[in-house]
Amino acid sequence: MDVIGRRVFLKSATMAGTAAALGIGPRARAAEFQYKLGTDAPNGHPVNVRLQQAADAIRQKTNGQVDIQLFPNNQLGGSTDMLSQVRAGGIQFLSIPTSILSVVVPVAAICGIGFAFKDYDAVWRAMDGDLGAHIRTQTRKAHLVAMERILDNGFRQISTSSKPVTSPGDLDGLKIRVPPSPLWTSLFKSLKAAPTSINFAELYSALQTRIVDGQENSLPIINAGRLYEVQHYCSITNHMWDGYWVVANEAAFDALPQDARQLVAESFASAAVAQRADILGLSNSLRPSLEKVGLVFNEPDMAPFRATLSASGFYADWKKSFGAEAWALLEKYTGALA
């Protein structure tokens, strides 16, 4: 890990709280359930730190009955590949961005509507409330089980190699990497950019070779992925919020004894709450660290971007796509969108 990442990630505290013991005897048993948990987050990212702690707690509290092995940094394949594997049962658990989950659960992407959430308070009220519950229900219909609390992938910022983004006009024709998601593609096309879908594992080389000129991610991801080595500008746009759902293969999750299922759910929920605090702290501390290694920051006015999206029909189109029920749940926490 880079020097910045090592210093910042070491600030992560031990996971807050543990689930109640299962009442199994003190002698550890051989693992009855050996499961894999894949993530696309780089080594050292709080997603992996907290999920490893959750897996350790699950193993300890079940006296080894449930052994969940963590495979970070796309070791089991790219995000879309791992999604296919967890649906087929080759992987039992997966930490997955909402943008990728939306491939099979379209409404999962609704939290990424451009400029919808004004702050974290609105995000957590929505995702821990009725909007998150609706997404989890739809995920079950796809034979996946989403854990109760979503992890934080942060508000997303735009980085570029050639010029800062100060207005919508700066995005005109910009070749920018986005996750393989219709919502991301639609957002940047509405802003007249040229979005290209590339898996995160291939992003660094794509920026290095100028296949794309820019990308958009949270500051912790920009840091952990060392993207500052191949980008020069970072515009604090806060244009979208994204999170990681921990999802399980339905059959694998339901095969666990009821008390083990409860413990797994509680452990991952505790991990998510702790990870959110990690990301908030990282986001607040990373900007000066990234400035020291050469990344140049600016803070554009968001009003022209919102006006461009409204005029393009972006909001109206996605309201039709997600449906009245889901859109009403979104606006319950964001207020009316243009």
Task: Please provide the spans of the model-predicted regions.
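N-terminal secretory/targeting leader peptides
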Residues: 2-122, 130-338
